[in-house]
Regions:
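Charge-rich amphipathic alpha-helical interaction elements
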Residues: 1-122
Length: 122
């Protein structure tokens, strides 16, 4: 009976390790996406600075195009900020889930050790 319990604990351990690996991959993917967003935001800010540094006399059509472009850049920056906030929230959720899984794994390993000691005891 102890052997069966130990086998069950080992299967659970494998499942927990698989889940932890998957969570690690998801976190890595989120970090990569966050780096991409940060890079894109920097590009947009650079474009914004270039556009706002234009000097000289502009006609109505040129000014309208500039305003439209700046408005588009602003909405894109806002969209990226919202996406980054969502990524940060998801990272927090995954980190919490990962911590829970690590706790479960530690408990499982401790229980396995106890079962092994009971099995070896005369």
């Amino acid at each position: 009976m102890l052997r069966q319990l130990l086998d069950i604990k080992r299967r659970r351990e494998r499942g927990l390790r698989t889940t932890l690996a998957r969570l690690g991959e998801e976190l890595q993917s989120l970090r990569l996406r966050q780096q991409q967003l940060t890079s894109r935001q920097a590009e947009l800010h650079q474009q914004w600075r270039q556009l706002t540094q234009q000097a000289g006399c502009m006609n109505q059509a040129t000014l309208s195009r500039l305003r439209a472009t700046l408005c588009t850049l602003e909405s894109e920056v806002e969209r990226l900020a919202h996406e980054q906030d969502a990524l940060i929230a998801e990272q927090g959720r995954l980190n919490q889930l990962r911590a829970e899984q690590e706790t479960r794994l530690r408990l499982n390993l401790r229980e396995q050790e106890k079962l092994q000691l009971l099995e070896e005891a005369p």
